[in-house]
Amino acid sequence: MKEKIVIALGGNAIQTKEATAEAQQTAIRRAMQNLKPLFDSPARIVISHGNGPQIGGLLIQQAKSNSDTTPAMPLDTCGAMSQGMIGYWLETEINRILTEMNSDRTVGTIVTRVEVDKDDPRFDNPTKPIGPFYTKEEVEELQKEQPGSVFKEDAGRGYRKVVASPLPQSILEHQLIRTLADGKNIVIACGGGGIPVIKKENTYEGVEAVIDKDFASEKLATLIEADTLMILTNVENVFINFNEPNQQQIDDIDVATLKKYAAQGKFAEGSMLPKIEAAIRFVESGENKKVIITNLEQAYEALIGNKGTHIHM
């Protein structure tokens, strides 16, 4: 069997100063060109991606157009919208590349639900800001309409709604994703960390939360029995003491040493630390698992061992 890889695209892959569809599609086109050698390789590929700016824009649109005739959609539904939108853009550009290569591979997007624990303590301490900024007066009105919602001041720029970021427990569509990936298909899944859902009676329902993309990608990689989790970010390597005079580049590291560095606070919370924690979980999930952390431009060189940070047991 060929190597199976989950590629977690960082936000920089689709980030642009302009928020138009055309500008974001152009950014994705450039990003996918960097992955062209991987698409031309025998590897079985699943791609996950972030959705922060996109879902933020959707939430602002929902708030501005909210009325009896066009009611605002909830966060879980906006998450599904963003998965479809970004998945469509990715499909278009990957399909363009596959056609140029005369490849017989196909590409498709799975709108992905991620099960979370309704008793996760993170629900008691929402910290993830989403959507537009509000004045204090607007927040007072919103809290009457949404009594369960939490709003916090954001660096003096106004107030924003904050939601929980629970840990993923399972990926509901993982068997479908695995079946597709084990063929020649390139699968786009777990966009934005997936749509958070909890089990209720004989089905699942969405909850107001945002799942960390790297944790969701790790869970997906584990469930589909991937060999490699590749986390693409905005730096070529992981560093300890990043941006300090004594910063040190890591090229190859075992999990035991990585855990020691994490415990010593060598990685920044909210940026590199979640990636490190996801890497540790995946490597420990089975035999011969590896994680590569690098930037988009070096993805293929990292896969063949020439670039990036390589993490193993």
Curated annotation (Swiss-Prot):
It is found in: Cytoplasm. The keyword Transferase applies. Pathway: Metabolic intermediate metabolism; carbamoyl phosphate degradation; CO(2) and NH(3) from carbamoyl phosphate: step 1/1. Its EC number is 2.7.2.2. InterPro entries: AceGlu_kinase-like_sf (IPR036393), Asp/Glu/Uridylate_kinase (IPR001048), Carb_kinase (IPR003964). One of its GO terms (molecular function) is ATP binding. GO terms for cellular component: cytosol. Disulfide bonds: none annotated. It is an enzyme of class 2 (transferase). GO terms for biological process: arginine deiminase pathway. CDD domains: AAK_CK (cd04235). Gene3D superfamilies: Acetylglutamate kinase-like. Its main location: cytoplasm. It catalyses: hydrogencarbonate + NH4(+) + ATP = carbamoyl phosphate + ADP + H2O + H(+). Keywords: Arginine metabolism, ATP-binding, Cytoplasm, Kinase, Nucleotide-binding, Transferase. Belongs to the carbamate kinase family. This is Carbamate kinase 2. It comes from Staphylococcus aureus (strain MRSA252).
